[in-house]
């Protein structure tokens, strides 16, 4: 139906006859001439219709051109010629196509929005097929496509084996809630959609495949936000006979090469590294954005002798923290704006937010100054590096909570005070805690997942020091986004059973849920490790968008709905009966 793509018509084709197909982006009838911007996935070319006096065929052609509306689907035949007025905004802007034939392949109904408009997100998702026609959306989807293609080429060239793992699998506790699928042939029993291929890729290592990868679809029934979807795509990788640096060095080289190939970005020749403890201490986050030149400063030793009980209680608590965040130029904040910072901190667990504000002339404004002697107050300001025109926020309380809300303030200040440097800031975060204590459940939970190996090989040591145990987990972070997470796995069945026990999973429950894994580990499992990268998140970073929904062709809303297909939707009673499911009436 076509000989060339619209966006690729150029000067080399001048004088030649071409056949094009695409959508009417714009049609302009100027009386004596019609101009049609014809669009396909490669771009736009101008089609010109010039009636010839006394020529019935050209008059009919002009009539067809004058009748065109937005997004009508056309096939156009014509001759390429040089344009009198060059359009530098188009790749085809030096030429035009003089139409000799126009066929309307399909008329478009009146549009809810035009391809060059950007309506609200609900409208975009309801008419996703129209939204995806927009040049910006085409660009972002192409970025994702190029990313996946480049990853496959890179790994295929290095003898990684692309192996599919099941979509219908066993429900196992991996952190988030499972999506369940009733098993028609086994009444009362269910499959689960995989949250990740974690256990299957480990079993592939036991099976001797050595180097595995998969562009895997994953499913987690959890609350949605700009960087999270119910179903998502990850590059899943696993290596046999490796230590942490073997995995890290390989994938660091891979990510560096992929960014260069896909978006022509040169990432650092060597990614910086820091432990989880250092990241939390300096930045209040296990995925710090190093483009923001602000750091938290511990001030517990300087406030122990103050008369401010909130500070002294935390400073004298072994599990407490008093941290300061200096914001250059922050003295410009009004009282209302300071309250907004306090409210933001409260979302992350802060019960209050103290501050010291220094005017450009050095005048102090602070609700806590009265609790310090003149000497100790001056020492505090010196320690945090405060100067005229700055504001210093203080957080006090439990170490983790203070780190969390002060880290959130750091990000907010970085954005609002334009303190985020241009460029790309990758890093490795390593040595994560093995466990964290869940107050509500009154037990340990795995910080990464239950299959991450501890840094110690001795089970007695792990049991005795579970609270402070360090794992062999690692994350790759880019501009404040965790783009990849992995670990060295447990390959000994006795260690895996011990970790289950520490997580409150008894031997009987472990056998019921993970018996297949424990059995596999008993038959000569090699040391192994791996990592998974979020394709959606990396594509969003490459495309320059904050929402992964922009790089997913058919995403869900934050309300977990597909507005285009109207999913989820009710199921007929006979279909439910076939899978032995009865739906309880909604509670009014």
UniProtKB/Swiss-Prot annotation:
Give the UniProt record's GO annotations in the biological process aspect.
Answer: aspartyl-tRNA aminoacylation
Classification via Gene3D superfamilies: Bira Bifunctional Protein, Domain 2, GAD-like domain, Nucleic acid-binding proteins
> Which CDD domains does the record associate with it?
AspRS_core (cd00777), EcAspRS_like_N (cd04317)
Please list the residues that bind ATP: 220-222, 229, 482, 534-537
Just give the chief location class.
Answer: cytoplasm
The record's region (Aspartate) falls at: 198-201
- Which cell locations does it reside in? Cytoplasm
Q: Give the first-level EC class, as a single word.
A: ligase
The record's EC number reads: 6.1.1.12
Which reaction equations make up its catalytic activity?
A: tRNA(Asp) + L-aspartate + ATP = L-aspartyl-tRNA(Asp) + AMP + diphosphate
Question: What GO molecular-function term can you cite, just one?
Answer: nucleic acid binding
Q: Name one GO cellular component term.
A: cytoplasm
Quaternary structure and partners: Homodimer.
Q: What does this protein do?
A: Catalyzes the attachment of L-aspartate to tRNA(Asp) in a two-step reaction: L-aspartate is first activated by ATP to form Asp-AMP and then transferred to the acceptor end of tRNA(Asp).
Full protein name:
Aspartate--tRNA ligase
The organism of origin for this protein = Xanthomonas axonopodis pv. citri (strain 306)
**Gene name, Swiss-Prot/TrEMBL:** aspS
